């Protein structure tokens, strides 16, 4: 298989974890006979420094022409006073690609469960599906005076139906349960959200649906996260709750994410930030980036076996006691990546010997 992947290393630790992603992809090429054209493009703060824009037109054009996009990290205090903020480029990239579904799997390795703030963290295994294109971030009018500020929250039926349908399709391949999170006791947009969700649910009789108000959901994520399978919610609620959920893993360096469009390339990235305090020190945890690669292989390219091989290698290395500083170990970014690649190679040899 041949695929073109645009690599947006970005800022902070982004270039370091992107290098890990590339090395893992090269190992997949060698072990399974695929070929990936990896195209580097400027994005975020580094793009501002070079072009004055966080998302240069050349970068967006390259992304649109690709089969998938990998993003390292974006932003940092260096650009706090800049006219253009790096994070603005991420919103523009999502809009340009037309991605509407942000997918964050939240799982906890038994080897790192002790790092979670919760007891029985190894029972956590759910996915947060967040709507990305509507809601309060993208609705108008928006206005502010010295005395009054106004934001508008708008959702169209087709936006709700599209994201909820995606969540049900995902749940039908997992534990067959969807939890829809809204504020239907107060917000008109949430009342429509709930109505459309119930209509979609009729098409999936084998999938259980439950509704939870967002304030109760925030509590349940901490009190009983094992109850969840697929969570689906609107943009603002999803932004907040997915960050809350990510803390359950004990380190932001562990979890990947994907953003999908109806047509065209998807965007894959670790959920962690640019971590400027450790940038360039070979300390960044590359697991989330490597898992983003695994998601890309499975979800965009249909290479489920190859994606699983990466996941299994990561788990095996963690079981051996090797891990980076953020999860209690002494491995560097490069040494942990090397260990994962070695494990992938060994597992492939064992598989061929059967």
UniProtKB/Swiss-Prot annotation:
Family: Belongs to the isocitrate and isopropylmalate dehydrogenases family. LeuB type 1 subfamily.
Function: Catalyzes the oxidation of 3-carboxy-2-hydroxy-4-methylpentanoate (3-isopropylmalate) to 3-carboxy-4-methyl-2-oxopentanoate. The product decarboxylates to 4-methyl-2 oxopentanoate.
Location(s) in or outside the cell: Cytoplasm
Gene: leuB
Organism: Bacillus cereus (strain ZK / E33L)
Keyword Transmembrane helix carried by entry: no
EC numbers on record: 1.1.1.85
BP GO annotations: L-leucine biosynthetic process
Enzyme class: oxidoreductase
SMART domains: Iso_dh
Principal location class: cytoplasm
Subunit and partners: Homodimer.
Cofactor note: Binds 1 Mg(2+) or Mn(2+) ion per subunit.
Signal sequence bounds: none
Residues reported to bind Mg(2+): 215, 239, 243
Residues binding substrate: 94, 104, 130, 215
Required cofactor(s): Mg(2+); Mn(2+)
Important for catalysis (site feature) positions: 137, 183
Superkingdom in the source lineage: Bacteria
InterPro entries per the UniProt record, alphabetical: IsoCit/isopropylmalate_DH_CS, IsoPropMal-DH-like_dom, Isopropylmalate_DH
Listed name of the protein: 3-isopropylmalate dehydrogenase
One GO CC annotation: cytosol
Keyword field: Amino-acid biosynthesis, Branched-chain amino acid biosynthesis, Cytoplasm, Leucine biosynthesis, Magnesium, Manganese, Metal-binding, NAD, Oxidoreductase
UniProt keyword annotation of Plastid present: no
């Amino acid at each position: 298989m041949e695929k073109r992947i645009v690599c947006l290393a970005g800022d902070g630790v982004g270039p370091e974890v992107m290098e890990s992603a590339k090395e893992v992809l090269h190992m997949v090429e060698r072990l399974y006979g695929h070929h990936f054209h990896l195209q580097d493009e400027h994005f975020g703060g580094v793009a501002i420094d070079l072009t004055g824009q966080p998302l240069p037109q050349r970068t967006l054009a390259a992304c649109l022409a690709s089969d998938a996009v990998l993003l390292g990290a974006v932003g940092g205090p260096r650009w706090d006073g800049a006219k253009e903020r790096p994070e603005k480029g991420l919103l523009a990239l999502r809009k340009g690609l037309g991605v509407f579904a942000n997918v964050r799997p939240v799982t906890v390795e038994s080897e790192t469960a002790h790092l979670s703030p919760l007891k029985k963290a190894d029972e956590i295994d759910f996915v947060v599906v967040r709507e990305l294109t509507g809601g309060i971030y993208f609705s108008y009018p928006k206005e502010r005076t010295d005395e009054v500020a106004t934001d508008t929250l708008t959702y169209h039926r087709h936006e709700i139906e599209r994201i909820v349908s995606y969540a049900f399709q995902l749940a039908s391949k997992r534990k067959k349960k969807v939890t829809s999170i809204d504020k239907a006791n107060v917000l008109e947009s949430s009342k429509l959200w709930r109505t459309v969700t119930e209509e979609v649910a009729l098409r999936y009789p084998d999938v259980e649906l439950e509704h939870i108000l967002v304030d109760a959901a925030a509590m349940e994520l901490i009190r009983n996260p094992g109850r969840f399978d697929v969570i689906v919610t609107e943009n603002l609620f999803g932004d907040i709750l997915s960050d809350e959920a990510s803390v359950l893993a004990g380190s932001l360096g562990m979890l990947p994410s994907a953003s999908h469009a109806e047509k065209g390339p998807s965007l894959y990235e670790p959920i962690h930030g640019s971590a400027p305090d450790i940038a360039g020190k070979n300390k960044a945890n590359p697991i989330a980036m490597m898992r983003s690669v695994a998601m890309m292989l499975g979800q965009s390219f249909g290479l489920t076996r190859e994606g699983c091989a990466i996941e299994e290698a990561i788990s095996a290395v963690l079981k051996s006691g090797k891990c980076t500083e953020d999860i209690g170990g002494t491995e560097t970014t490069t040494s942990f990546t090397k260990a994962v690649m070695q494990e992938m190679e060994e597992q492939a040899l064992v598989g061929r010997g059967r």
